[in-house]
């Protein structure tokens, strides 16, 4: 497991204690070198409200970087790293809405739903950051 320091990407992951797919996503992120701080909540509505995450962008867990960027849902760790290299102006993070099959933590054999990773902006508008088929 990576150690926290100034050079490592650190995410605080807000999740419910009983969500197995969130635990699988955390394992994926840790294996990619991301330091994870887990925060369990019985209800995530207060977290989603605090960070002003539009319901159309929501998923089962919310990750926050030490710089305040939001990563909502089952986003591939490499995509998070790519975004953080050059965040879009006025963006607040990325979202994979829902829980698409084949996204990290949602693996089901070889099945892979086509899904998009969205950039979400301060005004809660969004645009496509990339398609799942473009994730290497």
Where are these regions (language model features)?
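Short, well-ordered coil/turn elements that cap or connect secondary structure elements
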Residues: 6, 31-33, 88-89, 112
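Sec-exported extracytoplasmic/periplasmic mature domains
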Residues: 27-34, 49-53, 69, 85
């Amino acid at each position: 497991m990576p150690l926290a320091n100034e050079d490592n990407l650190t995410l605080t992951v807000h999740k419910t204690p009983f969500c197995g797919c969130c635990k699988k996503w955390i394992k994926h992120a840790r294996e990619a070198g991301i330091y994870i701080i887990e925060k369990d909540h019985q209800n995530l509505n207060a977290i989603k409200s605090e960070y002003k995450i539009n319901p159309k962008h929501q998923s089962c867990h919310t990750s926050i970087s030490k710089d305040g960027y939001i990563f909502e849902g089952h986003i591939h760790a490499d995509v998070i790293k790519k975004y953080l290299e050059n965040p879009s102006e006025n963006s607040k993070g990325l979202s994979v809405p829902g829980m698409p099959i084949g996204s990290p933590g949602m693996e089901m054999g070889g099945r892979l739903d086509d899904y998009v990773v969205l950039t979400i902006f301060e005004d809660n508008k969004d645009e496509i950051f990339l398609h799942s088929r473009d994730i290497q």
